[in-house]
A protein has these predicted regions:
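Hydrophobic core segments of alpha-helical transmembrane domains in multi-pass membrane transport
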Residues: 30-35, 126-136, 194-202, 235-239, ...
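Short, strongly hydrophobic alpha-helical membrane anchors
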Residues: 1-15, 407
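Alpha-helical membrane-protein architecture signal
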Residues: 8, 12, 55, 59, ...
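Juxtamembrane and boundary regions of transmembrane helices in multi-pass small-molecule transporters
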Residues: 51, 56, 116-161, 282-368
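Transmembrane alpha-helices
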Residues: 340-366, 372-407
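Transmembrane helical segments that form the transport core of multi-pass membrane transport proteins
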Residues: 40, 46, 177, 181-259, ...
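Membrane-interfacial helix-loop connectors
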Residues: 65-123, 206-299
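Alpha-helical transmembrane segments in multi-pass membrane proteins
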Residues: 21, 25, 29, 33, ...
Length: 407
């Protein structure tokens, strides 16, 4: 019983640590997404990245490189790009770049894994984008994309604003604030449940369980090709049940690597943050299930091929990383400290409070609108119930942590 209570407390603190690490990235991504929705015209977006040419894909990838690494924030921005007329390939290139090519992700990988995985992440990110482009070109989902655009236009937020009005009109700030709040309203349930499950898995499930999933792990010599391919396919399955996000799954990836999982399995696990269930749900709420499953299928095929290519690229070059070089998960309490995350969280917390004040003030003046995206389907009701249960679980676990003490 004591072990269960200790793990419960660790799970709650781990979840809190994951969210603490990602909060500023969520906020940054949703600010960018909100700004695109409020200020960018459809004509400008179509002109910039409206077609799947090298320039459009390159620009979209560069914008993704500069953006937040948070999966949910990237999803929101991608939806905004599509709604404003961006082509499917450039929009998906932005999504892949924002979760695979950002600088902070490389830093985290270097800390938990090794330099080879940093190279694999960035080279693999480029390969993912090129393979995605090829798959979309072959499958030609034009009719599906048109239906998605019709849905996004129906859900649109009215005429765009002039960004210069930020300096002279509080109404524009209020509109930006409402859009920002709507971004959070659409994903808070998925984020809460996903991060809570990640904390539970990190605390209760031993690393040996995940290494058991990957055939060829722990054997003498290099795994055979079919074992490498199987590990690349199973990597997304493991990620599906351990969703944390493009940043948070790196510590779990280090545990897999420390227990002998191949480079292909690790890279596939890392690349899989965009095809797990919470992400599928968010995409389905944006585009419908058919489009969400299409995107997941494209990403799955691309990441399996990419992971295998990276594995053999290192093997043939003699630069394969040494098994056992990773350090594993940090202690739950080690995620909280006075560092850049603390400063950024304070800054974006202040931005969020300011937006909240603007929304409240607009309602007090009779302005603003109330938006309810909760829905009434059984799936939405179930997810809301799970999110509320997650809050109870986390609150009780954090209280336990206070009584139990320790790291």
């Amino acid at each position: 019983m004591q072990d269960f209570l200790t793990n419960w407390a660790d799970a709650a603190l781990t979840t809190a640590g994951f969210f603490w690490t990602a909060f500023w990235a969520f906020c940054l991504g949703y600010v960018i997404s909100s700004a695109i929705q409020v200020f960018v015209t459809e004509d400008r977006m179509r002109e910039t990245i409206g077609k799947a040419g090298p320039k459009s894909v390159g620009l979209a990838s560069f914008f993704g490189f500069l953006s937040s690494s948070c999966s949910f924030a990237a999803l929101a921005t991608t939806r905004s790009l599509l709604a404003k007329g961006a082509g499917l390939v450039p929009a998906l290139a932005f999504l892949l770049a924002s979760t695979n090519l950002v600088v902070e992700l490389g830093v985290i990988i270097a800390l938990f894994l090794s330099w080879q995985f940093v190279v694999g992440e960035y080279v693999g990110g480029v390969i993912l984008i090129l393979l995605m482009w090829l798959i979309v070109r072959v499958t030609r989902p034009e009719r599906l994309v048109e239906r998605v655009r019709e849905k996004l236009e129906t859900d649109g937020g009215g005429e765009p604003e002039d960004i210069s009005d930020l300096l002279k009109s509080r109404r524009v700030w209020e509109k930006l604030s409402r859009t920002y709040a709507m971004e959070w309203q659409m994903v808070w349930k998925d984020v809460t449940v996903g991060f809570t499950l990640a904390g539970i898995i990190a605390a209760f499930v031993p690393a040996e369980f995940f290494t058991w999933l990957f055939p060829g792990t722990g054997q003498e010599g290099d795994p055979a090709f079919l074992q490498v391919l199987a590990q690349a396919v199973i990597g997304p399955v493991a990620a599906f049940f351990t969703f944390i996000g493009s940043m948070g799954n790196i510590p779990l990836a280090s545990l897999l690597f420390a227990n002998g999982v191949s480079v292909a399995g690790i890279m596939a696990f890392i690349f899989s943050d965009l095809i797990v269930f919470p992400v599928l749900r968010v995409n389905a709420s944006f585009y419908g299930w058919k489009m969400a499953l299409y995107i997941a299928g494209v990403f799955f095929a691309a990441l399996v091929v990419t992971a295998v290519a990276i594995h053999y690229g290192f093997a043939f070059s003699g630069l394969a990383p040494d098994i056992g070089a990773s350090g594993g998960l940090p202690e739950p309490s080690d995620r909280f400290g006075i560092d850049y995350t603390f400063v950024l969280n304070l800054a974006f917390g202040a931005v969020t409070l300011a937006f909240g004040w603007l929304i409240w003030h607009a309602r007090g003046d009779g302005g603003g609108h109330h938006h309810d995206h909760g829905g009434s389907s059984w799936g939405e009701k179930l997810l809301r119930s799970l999110a509320l249960l997650s809050f109870v679980w986390l609150a009780a676990g954090l209280v336990l942590r206070l009584f139990l003490g320790g790291n």
